[in-house]
Amino acid sequence: MASSSVEFRCFVGGLAWATDSNSLEKAFSVYGEIVEAKIVSDRETGRSRGFGFVTFLEEEAMRSAIEAMNGHILDGRNITVNEAQQRGGGGGGGYNRGGGYGGRRDGGGFSRGGGGGYGGGGGGGYGGGRDRGYGGGGGYGGGRDSRGSGGGGSEGGWRN
């Protein structure tokens, strides 16, 4: 089975900083065969952003995992598990990649917003510049996290 356009992927949020892809896969593998388990990390620091994705081979396995693991304690943290939204096809986002500045502007290290993130071009993805890096700004696959007029790609630039 080459690359299928159908994915059975869960979003897993609220993860402990210590949770890695291997422990995520181990926790979810009891529900079915896993294609991929991935913790999303910050591009600049390499630190976990506190969320990840688990992709199952079969839909039934994904549904079982969502039902059983949502609200479950993993590595000392109460996690949230939902069906992941499909990535945007890249259209509509252009060069803006996630709405510009995002949330925080205090030098907290996450001032780049979602940086495109999951959710694709133009959307806030999972970013939003929050301390944990998810659930803020545009939210889960949400709208734009821009300042006023809708960003603008080349205007203002990124805060580094």
Swiss-Prot record:
Keywords: Plant defense, RNA-binding, Secreted. It is found in: Secreted. GO terms for biological process: defense response; extracellular transport; miRNA transport; regulation of defense response to virus; RNA transport. Residues 88-157 are annotated as: Glycine-rich (GR) required for cell-to-cell movement. The glycine-rich (GR) domain is necessary and sufficient for cell-to-cell movement and to interefere with zucchini yellow mosaic virus (ZYMV) infection. Binds to small phloem-mobile single-stranded RNAs (ss-sRNA, e.g. small interfering RNA (siRNA) and microRNA (miRNA)) in the phloeme exudate, including viral-derived sRNA (vsiRNA). Belongs to the GR-RBP family. This is Small RNA binding protein 1. It comes from Cucumis sativus. The gene is SRBP1.
